[in-house]
Amino acid sequence: MESISLTSLASEKLAEAGRSHSGRAAHTIHGGHTHELRQTVLALLAGHDLSEHDSPGEASLQVLQGHVRLTTGDDTWEGKAGDYVVIPAERHALHAIEDSVIMLTVLKSLPANH
């Protein structure tokens, strides 16, 4: 059984985001392209965004640190450390109100020939 410290990883990714022109950094902690389940820790500096994009499939967002705003066409949700939301299956965007770290969990269907 393998485990990691989300607290340590969050600090590491925030530091990396601070050195990045995009103001963000990410690390997949489970899964990837050959798995149906993927969990990614994403750090986003205050004022930076993940611009509007299509939903990748069934997904949830857990705020590990900071304060973020998730927007869809008709709705807005704000979350702080410890908050959790199921991401609607529609176009959405994420904005960091404060330096923030989230864990994004996505369930994707694999191609039938995989």
Which residue ranges define each predicted feature?
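A cytosolic small-molecule/anion-sensing beta-strand core signal
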Residues: 64-65, 80-81, 98
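Glycine- and acidic-residue-biased ligand/ion/polar-headgroup-sensing regions
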Residues: 57-73
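Conserved short histidine dyad/triad with adjacent acidic residue
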Residues: 23-26, 38-55
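Short acidic-glycine-tyrosine-enriched beta hairpin
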Residues: 73-89
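A short, N-terminal "cap"/entry segment at the start of jelly-roll beta-barrel domains
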Residues: 1-36, 71
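Short beta-strand segments in beta-sandwich/barrel cores
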Residues: 48-50, 66-71, 92
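Ligand-binding loop in jelly-roll beta-barrel domains
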Residues: 89-112
